[in-house]
UniProtKB/Swiss-Prot annotation:
This is Protein-arginine N-acetylglucosaminyltransferase SseK2. The keyword Membrane does not apply. The gene is sseK2. It catalyses: L-arginyl-[protein] + UDP-N-acetyl-alpha-D-glucosamine = N(omega)-(N-acetyl-beta-D-glucosaminyl)-L-arginyl-[protein] + UDP + H(+). Disruption phenotype: Reduced virulence. The active site is at residue 271. It is found in: Secreted; Host Golgi apparatus. One of its GO terms (cellular component) is extracellular region. Keywords: Glycosyltransferase, Host Golgi apparatus, Manganese, Metal-binding, Secreted, Toxin, Transferase, Virulence. It comes from Salmonella typhimurium (strain SL1344). Changing residue 260 to A: Abolished protein-arginine N-acetylglucosaminyltransferase activity. Disulfide bonds: none annotated.
Length: 348
């Protein structure tokens, strides 16, 4: 505990430096959090009114740490990066201290040693609202699909097209992928294929699966102290470089969903550093999963998240991308966004 406190004291000094740096960045835009229902109670986009749905002060916060190289940590150490440049563990602890009334989830995966698992358990004991959820404790079979089925469906669809409109390169590529899967692992699925490369696709894919479960993930994992969470509830995912400075309060989001938007040099883009949903199996995320089930090489960020959101809210794409980013953006004055951009991300 003394070790945690000493580290936390050091990091508070760094937090003040980061705040000073961010205050000098003219492209950082935030607004005051919505702590009471807006007078209109809805927002319009692409000619449709969407209700502003609440995420109350007990909606769990979720951080994620998937570690592909646990050996870089001590055998009895918490396997989450915690350096002066990248104080990710301290950011999580900081959130648990500020948001004492909320459950703070840490969604983890990796070939951890017995001592590292024990250290994660000790973290839960020291901060009673922190709940460590192991990826292996959750069942995702209801969201899975065999790769052979995905490939065969795409081959049938492509071959049904006229020769002039058919993408022959894609067709041949899918046929080759089907041949490889049938030869090497006919039972391979969308989920098992994302366990091969322990990189950002692995990280992004399982984040989306967790968000489909929402607060049900805590109940499924049997975490104590979560009895107050309602089945079918949502959660707020934060990258570990997102720094809380105060409580988030109750949030009101269009149809109960919002994500982080990066704004740099007059360019905006949807980012998965923050994803908030007010319910499990949000239809926008289900739409993205349908895209993953229908594409031969779906990407969990570009297809599942970005395209899934756009198809759900603006299927005909009558609104431009910037307008959609403005509509779906998660904003809050009590979060310093993407602090690793001030140093360098150490997740690799």
């Amino acid at each position: 505990m003394a070790r945690f406190n000493a580290a936390f004291t050091r990091i508070k000094i760094m937090f003040s430096r980061i705040r000073g740096l961010i205050s000098c960045q003219s492209n950082t835009q935030t607004i005051a959090p919505t702590l009471s229902p807006p007078s209109s109670g809805h927002v319009s986009f692409a000619g449709i009114d969407y209700p502003l749905l609440p995420l109350n002060h007990q909606t769990p916060l979720v951080f994620q740490w998937f570690e592909r190289n646990p050996d870089r940590f001590g055998q009895n150490e918490i396997p989450i990066i915690n350096t002066q440049k990248n104080p990710y563990l301290n950011n999580i602890i900081n959130a648990a201290i500020i948001e004492k009334e909320r459950i703070i989830g840490i969604f983890v995966d990796g070939d951890f040693s017995k001592g590292q698992r024990k250290a994660l358990g000790k973290l839960e004991q020291n901060y009673r609202n922190i709940k460590v959820i192991y990826n292996s404790d959750l069942n995702y079979s209801m969201y899975d699909k065999k790769l052979t089925t995905i490939y065969l469906e795409n081959i049938t669809k492509l071959e049904a097209q006229s020769a002039s409109e058919r993408d022959e390169v894609l067709l041949n590529g899918v046929k080759k992928s089907l041949e490889d899967v049938l030869k090497n692992n006919p039972e391979e699925t969308l989920i098992s294929s994302h366990n091969k490369d322990k990189g950002h696709l692995w990280f992004d894919f399982y984040r989306n699966l967790f968000l489909l479960k929402g607060s049900d993930a805590f109940l499924e994992a049997g975490k104590p102290g979560c009895h107050h969470l309602q089945p079918g509830g949502g959660c707020i995912y934060l990258d570990a470089d997102m720094l809380l400075t105060d409580k988030l309060g109750t949030l009101y989001l269009p149809d109960g969903i919002a994500i982080h938007v990066s704004r740099k040099d007059n360019h905006v883009s949807l980012e998965n550093g923050i994803i908030a949903v007010n319910r499990s199996e949000h239809p926008a995320l289900i739409k993205g999963l349908e895209i993953m089930h229908s594409k031969p090489y779906g990407d969990p960020y570009n297809d599942w998240l970005s395209k899934g959101l756009r198809h759900y809210f603006d299927g005909s794409h009558i609104q431009d991308y910037d307008a959609f980013c403005d509509f779906i953006e998660f904003k809050h004055e009590n979060i310093i966004m993407n602090t690793s951009s001030l140093t360098a991300s150490s997740w690799r």
